[in-house]
């Protein structure tokens, strides 16, 4: 019981104005000593935007499409989560020590909190953005099952918090826009979750080109097949069922829940949708990013 008392529902902590899970905020100090390498590859997303999906795609690419090699460890061990920290589990920095080059790394950090070494080394970044409505709904369910977050409250109150950036990692609007801006000056492949759902093979080809690798077409098809939502949901190396229940309670909501575009329509009321759209138009004014909220 000690572990549960220690981990359950701590309030968010603000770092440079960004709200973070308490343990992740504590990890930022040690993270400053992190040294990036030019052959590192960073996977960056706002939470609930397809991070695990693109991580598995990239690990399969790095392993030449060998599924057995991708079963060597859970995804969070194969692709260290830089700012991860929780009692009784190896931190992202600790996992990193045992990761051979070339390394795949994962973060949800906004640019203000990103270790400068990643930018100095011009580390390539694969960024995935997902439409805000589906992110908000998915995040609400994730808050329920991942007990390192505060209580999510009602859907209506959570949506309000999401709109003003008072959820872990702060504003979705700022996150997607600042990484989009960075793509003009830094090697960033900016992908959209909805494009990946619509045509995964096309998007995987983009990733291959970006990382300077090639695979035979039948291997690419194999990667598409084994990184489908259906396959990843039942794969213990990708579905987070190996994480202790004190941290993630899959009986509340599975980590891999629906993995679709447009599911927000089952949750948003008409009034919530109208309010969200008006606020969205204001926050995204002048931004050239365009999202599809359904397929």
Swiss-Prot record:
Instruction: Give the UniProt tissue specificity note.
Output: Liver, lung, adrenal, brain, platelets and skin.
Annotated Pfam families: Sulfotransfer_1
Q: Where does substrate bind?
A: 106-108
Q: What class of enzyme is it?
A: transferase
Annotated localization: Cytoplasm
Task: Report the residues modified as Phosphoserine.
Answer: 138
Gene3D superfamilies in alphabetical order: P-loop containing nucleotide triphosphate hydrolases
**Location of the active site:** 108
One MF term in the entry's GO annotations: steroid sulfotransferase activity
Q: Where does 3'-phosphoadenylyl sulfate bind?
A: 48-53, 130, 138, 193, 227-232, 255-259
Q: What is the effect of changing residue 213 to H?
A: In allele SULT1A1*2; has a lower sulfotransferase activity
What cellular-component terms does GO give this entry? cytoplasm; cytosol
* InterPro entries, A to Z: P-loop_NTPase, Sulfotransferase_dom
Q: Which reaction equations make up its catalytic activity?
A: a phenol + 3'-phosphoadenylyl sulfate = an aryl sulfate + adenosine 3',5'-bisphosphate + H(+); 17beta-estradiol + 3'-phosphoadenylyl sulfate = 17beta-estradiol 3-sulfate + adenosine 3',5'-bisphosphate + H(+); 4-ethylphenol + 3'-phosphoadenylyl sulfate = 4-ethylphenyl sulfate + adenosine 3',5'-bisphosphate + H(+); 4-nitrophenol + 3'-phosphoadenylyl sulfate = 4-nitrophenyl sulfate + adenosine 3',5'-bisphosphate
Biological processes annotated in GO: 3'-phosphoadenosine 5'-phosphosulfate metabolic process; amine metabolic process; dopamine catabolic process; estrogen metabolic process; ethanol catabolic process; flavonoid metabolic process; sulfation; thyroid hormone metabolic process
Instruction: List UniProt keywords, sorted A-Z.
Output: Catecholamine metabolism, Cytoplasm, Lipid metabolism, Phosphoprotein, Steroid metabolism, Transferase
Known EC number: 2.8.2.1
What does this chain do?
Sulfotransferase that utilizes 3'-phospho-5'-adenylyl sulfate (PAPS) as sulfonate donor to catalyze the sulfate conjugation of a wide variety of acceptor molecules bearing a hydroxyl or an amine group. Sulfonation increases the water solubility of most compounds, and therefore their renal excretion, but it can also result in bioactivation to form active metabolites. Displays broad substrate specificity for small phenolic compounds. Plays an important role in the sulfonation of endogenous molecules such as steroid hormones.
Which family would the database say this protein is a member of? Belongs to the sulfotransferase 1 family.
Q: Which PANTHER family does this entry report, sorted A to Z?
A: SULFOTRANSFERASE SULT (PTHR11783)
Assembly with partners or alone: Homodimer.
**What is the protein's given name?**
Sulfotransferase 1A1
**Which species is this UniProt entry from?**
Homo sapiens
